C-alpha cells in the first residue's frame, strides 16, 4: 500500500472532507502521508465549489502523531526524516526538513482562506495536535484526549507550538511539564475546542456544523477568518511559533550531540528507552 491510499478526499454539498485512513497504526503520520494531506488541503482550497473543509480520521484514535518507526510505508521507501549517505546528520539538515515537512504545512493549513473544521476522537498525541490546531473549529468526541509527551524525549513540545494560545499558559505548562492528557471537557473549558459531543454523533454533528457554515457568504467567511488570524498575528502568534520552533530544535541538537550524529528519531527513541518510558 502506498502512502497516497491513506488519505481520502470527498466533497459533500460544498464541504470537502479530508480523511486520514490508517487506523491500524492509530493514524500515525509519515512524510508521504503529510504530503498527501497537504495535496488534499490544496485541492480543497483551489476548488471554487468548496466553501468549508472538514478533517477527519478513521478508527479509535485521531492520530498517534509522527510514525516513530522511521520508515514511510510508501512505494519509494521514504524515511521519516532527512538522511545522509554516511548516516550522520547536521543540525541544519533536520531544521530544514522539519521546516518544510511540518511547520510550513501547519502554517499553510491554518491560513487557507476557507473555514476548516477538525473532528477529533480518541487520542490526539503530539503531531496529532498539528493536524487539528491549524483548523478554525474543533469538534471533539467525549472520549477525546489531547497530549504532547515529547518532553520525555528531551523536546519542549511539537514543532507547531500553539499550546499557550490553545490552552492558556498554565494549562499549557501542565500539559508539557507532566506529559499528561487534556480531556475533551477540559479542552472545551480552555477554549481549545468548540463542541464536545458523544462519539457516535461526532461525524453527523461536524457535518451539520460544516453545512451551516457553508451557507454564509464565502467572501464574508474569508474576511472573517483573515480578521481573526491577523488579530492573533498582531498579538504575536506567528512570531511565537517561529521562536518556539527554534527552541524545539535545540532539543534535536542536544540529541544529535549526545548520539554522535545519529538520526534524531533514533536518538529520541534511545532517550525514551533509557528513561524506561517506552518498550
PLM-predicted stretches and their roles:
Residues 18, 22, 36-37, 55, ...:
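Terminal peptide-recognition signature
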Residues 25, 57-104, 152:
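Glycine- (often His-adjacent) and acidic-residue-rich active-site loop
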Residues 33-36, 101, 202, 244:
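Hydrophobic alpha-helical membrane-association signature
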Residues 34-36, 69-73, 157:
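Glycine-rich, phosphate-binding/catalytic loops in enzymes
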Residues 107-221:
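Crotonase-fold acyl-CoA enzyme core
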Amino acid at each position: 500500500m502506498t502512502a497516497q491510499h491513506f488519505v481520502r478526499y470527498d466533497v459533500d454539498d460544498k464541504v470537502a472532507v479530508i480523511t486520514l485512513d490508517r487506523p491500524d497504526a492509530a493514524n500515525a503520520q509519515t512524510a508521504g502521508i503529510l504530503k498527501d494531506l497537504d495535496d488534499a488541503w490544496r485541492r480543497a482550497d483551489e476548488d471554487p465549489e468548496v466553501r468549508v473543509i472538514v478533517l477527519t480520521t478513521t478508527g479509535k484514535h485521531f492520530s498517534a502523531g509522527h510514525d516513530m518507526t522511521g520508515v514511510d510505508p510508501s512505494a519509494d521507501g521514504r524515511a521519516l526524516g532527512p538522511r545522509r549517505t554516511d548516516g550522520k546528520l547536521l543540525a541544519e539538515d533536520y531544521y530544514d526538513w522539519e521546516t518544510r515537512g511540518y511547520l510550513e504545512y501547519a502554517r499553510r493549513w491554518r491560513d487557507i482562506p476557507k473555514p476548516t473544521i477538525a473532528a477529533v476522537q480518541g487520542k490526539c498525541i503530539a503531531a496529532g495536535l498539528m493536524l487539528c490546531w491549524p483548523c478554525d473549529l474543533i469538534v471533539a468526541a467525549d472520549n477525546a484526549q489531547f497530549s504532547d509527551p515529547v518532553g520525555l524525549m528531551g523536546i519542549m513540545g511539537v514543532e507547531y507550538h500553539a499550546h499557550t494560545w490553545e490552552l492558556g499558559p498554565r494549562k499549557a505548562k501542565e500539559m508539557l511539564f507532566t506529559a499528561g492528557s487534556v480531556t475533551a471537557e477540559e479542552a472545551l473549558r480552555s477554549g481549545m475546542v468548540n463542541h464536545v459531543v458523544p462519539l457516535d454523533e461526532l461525524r453527523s454533528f461536524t457535518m451539520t456544523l460544516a453545512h451551516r457554515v457553508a451557507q454564509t457568504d464565502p467572501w464574508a467567511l474569508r474576511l472573517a477568518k483573515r480578521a481573526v488570524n491577523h488579530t492573533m498575528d498582531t498579538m504575536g502568534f506567528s512570531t511565537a511559533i517561529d521562536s518556539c520552533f527554534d527552541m524545539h530544535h535545540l532539543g534535536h541538537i542536544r540529541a544529535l550531540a549526545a548520539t554522535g550524529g545519529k538520526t534524531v528519531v533514533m536518538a529520541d527513541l534511545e532517550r525514551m528507552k533509557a528513561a524506561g518510558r517506552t518498550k
